[in-house]
Amino acid sequence: MSFDRQQVPAWRPGYRFQYEPAQKGHVLLYPEGMIKLNDSAGLIGGLIDGQRSVAAIIDELQQQFPGVPEVADDIEQFMEVARAEHWITLA
């Protein structure tokens, strides 16, 4: 099954992505708690704005990290996990 990169991710209502100094990293806040994101997830999460497609996010991060061939796969995997965990919607 291939991933549709034209989909546009958005954080679900009640979820807030932010940098948390106490955690020294990006977190995803939601009514029941908090998820500390790793550095890669933090970079991807910072580009989820409900306007950019997955393809646009991939393009942006490939420009920032031109020597990392697996960027696109990592972003797709993040999107699949985030959707399965109900952090985001994909439209």
From Swiss-Prot:
Origin: domain of life:
Bacteria
Assigned keywords, A-Z = PQQ biosynthesis
Q: Name one GO biological process term.
A: pyrroloquinoline quinone biosynthetic process
One Pfam match: PqqD
Q: In which pathway does it act?
A: Cofactor biosynthesis; pyrroloquinoline quinone biosynthesis
GO molecular function annotation: quinone binding
Keyword match Lipid biosynthesis? no
Q: What does this protein do?
A: Functions as a PqqA binding protein and presents PqqA to PqqE, in the pyrroloquinoline quinone (PQQ) biosynthetic pathway.
Entry-linked NCBIfam families:
PQQ_PqqD, PRK02079.1
The protein's matches in HAMAP family, at most eight in alphabetical order, are given as: PQQ_syn_PqqD (MF_00655)
What the record says about family reads: Belongs to the PqqD family.
How this chain assembles, per its entry, is: Monomer. Interacts with PqqE.
Return the protein name: PqqA binding protein
